[in-house]
């Protein structure tokens, strides 16, 4: 093909006036726009062509090669065009390829093929003849043709054919955005902007008026273009340069007839409904701009113009289909679609979809264990094979299949697929991600969901399949190969091809791994288990009760419905009859009314499950409450003990201090009065006082002085304490030597008798411990007996007892030269050690072993434990009593030793039990428990007198009587009353004696209870013996003796 090369020369005449000059002021040419160089007011490099600000006229001299006036369309050239600026190029060959320049053109003659990455899209040719009312074009018969520079702006209310005749808005729209509203695609004459490609524009630089004439040639080049339309799958990207170097491009691809026309028809209809207000404003602005352009006052005020090309009316547009992805339905029109979006059904499904996305792990764990059969097309799940088959045959599924067939969407296979609840959640999350991605890419000003306008000719199969594949078992993401037109309620048309936005690709890449990961989690189970589950779901349950379902016919004998007598229900679907007979409800009624032996799976109701969960939750809360309460009680008890210890420590220090102050010698201080406080607040010669303000202390009462005086009288002397300490320490050391000797003998015998290596046996004697009053510190003056417990590794026997009793004197002789008498008592299971030096002391060593208490005889059989025992084992009860004394000593050291006045009061009462026969039957261990409970239960620390009074009050209240609460032993596993050894008479006698002692305390006669003489009064006013009045001989003797006799009688009764 030979290219037509017209030579066009432009002559610049700066002084021309008249109508043509005014028209030229607008700088309007018959050039169409779409992919041409852009005009602006900033000069670009290599631009020699400039426009003045004065009135100018342009004449075009056409070479005789072209038969008519040139109104060049922008077309790319193969070779570099040596021009001063990027100018429009006439391409005759291209015009020939598109059907030449005749006026009659149809929209179907234009096909859009796939563009390569570097080639700008070629627009349709522009005709210069037969212009309609939109243009005022003047042709000149002279060789120099003058162009009318005025372009009349037409409002964007054109018909669909006029809109469809515009050059390639589907491709160029994404890259060339206009200032005026979008419906008519009207643009400013000298300003172009791009939405997605940033390009530098060539500016128009003002130049001085000059009569010089600039001539340049335009060489159009031919480009072979296939007349068959093809879908544009590649959006070209442009690189701005001073000159355009484009090569000839051959376009090829699949043909999509009517694709562009349908798109622009949809765009026209949509924007006519949404942007009528903006069109009116744009029309007013265009009129004002046109008026300013005719005045020629300013070069920059140029009225926007639209393309000066017309095409014949297009064929009727195909019907629009508004499809809702959430509800899987289509709407007839935008109004119906809008009403659907505002309806309750759509809102409920959308809320259900959001709820499924926000499903917690607990709900998933409850409902996720049930396998279901899912229909990918309708996005519904069925609990069994029968339900799935009924759904496939149902009208809803068939309707969706028909709609997808009409839209050209792929229809998934109807084979049932086993899915779980986690798969459904993954699908919902994936769909939510894709919808959020599409809404984020479009600048939407409407809050409604995206409206998808689909035509029957547009193929959406690939994008649909990609969405389906993202939720299927495989995580393969298919590449989008066809454009997806989505109108989102805004003012911007999005048309995308293979070049997907980076943000969308990033969102897709982020969404895909998550869905793939969820799918992989679902497919952890092997295929065999999935097959078994599918077989279990598809396993047919035998229908029962055919005879109880009767057919209801009309007058003509036609079956209109079915009625089940068992369930009292009716249904008109023949398919539902079989399902009802297999259903759980019908089977339960059949089992209840007909055959009780029918096996029906037990499926707990949601209400029962919720009740069970509520019970478990309350139980856990109750356990947590009690656990916390126990911890708090334990913490309070520990804090109370700590505070009491600290308080009593300060009290003792203060008591020592005041005792030292009261013990000042009669002659005064030996070294003079105490001096001033030292550097650390301590007076010389005085014990250090506690820091801080001294707590207020109640002065000693009369009862306290009596109790302390009595305690000092019954406390052991220093000689007795040293004697006890000496004999106990010697006994402990001797028993240690006996244990060592017995261990050495066992080793020697083992080596001689057997050469085999055996595990080393434990020592026969594990240790010796102090028990009784010796361990508790309750010794009284005159006590000569102390107790020790010797722990053995095995059950003690008579042979062991005799062996120890024989070895003990030898070891004692090694340690101490003094003589001791050692005797063994088999009935008492003990060894008795007596000293021969005054004060004579006696130590009772009881043998026991922890193995005895660990034995628990079986129910109904008392002898198994005794069968294994050696024949000469010692008395079991004596050994158990020794173990109990160990526990008692440990408890006393932990609980009673820390209480103030507790040990003092126990010593006083032990002395009372020894002096008064009534109290001799009171057990020592029960007495210790009673005193500890009485003192520890008080609100604060008790002085010795108050503590003794409180103990008598407790006994007087009847705590030890037969019907009383008693005293449980805290050292025993099973409940055991420590007062069990006392009879009723002994309990009543002790209670009565305590009440009498309490009366004596109330009348200041505590000395009678303690069995001591009254103390002398330190104050002379209360001293009876200092009475100066002379006593009558007769009265004094009778009254004193009588009073003394009465006191003596009361004391003896106590």
From Swiss-Prot:
Biased segments, Basic and acidic residues type? 744-761, 1042-1054
Give the UniProt entry's GO cellular component terms: cytoplasm; precatalytic spliceosome
Q: Which InterPro entries match?
A: DZF_dom, DZF_dom_C, DZF_dom_N, Matrin/U1-like-C_Znf_C2H2, NT_sf, Znf_C2H2_sf, Znf_C2H2_type
The GO terms this record gives for MF are:
DNA binding; double-stranded RNA binding; single-stranded RNA binding; zinc ion binding
- Primary location recorded for the protein, binned into one broad class: nucleus
- Judging by the UniProt lineage, the source's domain of life is Eukaryota
Key word tRNA-binding present: no
Pfam families registered for this protein in UniProt: DZF_C (PF20965), DZF_N (PF07528), zf-met (PF12874)
Keywords from the named record: Cytoplasm, Developmental protein, DNA-binding, Nucleus, Repeat, RNA-binding
Q: Where in the cell is it found?
A: Nucleus; Cytoplasm
Asked if the Swiss-Prot or TrEMBL record annotates the protein with the keyword tRNA processing, the reply is no
**Boundaries of each DZF domain copy?**
683-1053
Q: Where is this region: Disordered?
A: 342-366, 491-517, 657-702, 741-761, 1023-1054
Q: Where is the composition biased (Polar residues)?
A: 355-366
Q: What does this protein do?
A: Involved in postimplantation and gastrulation stages of development. Binds to DNA and RNA.
Identification of the protein by name: Zinc finger RNA-binding protein
Q: Which gene encodes it?
A: zfr
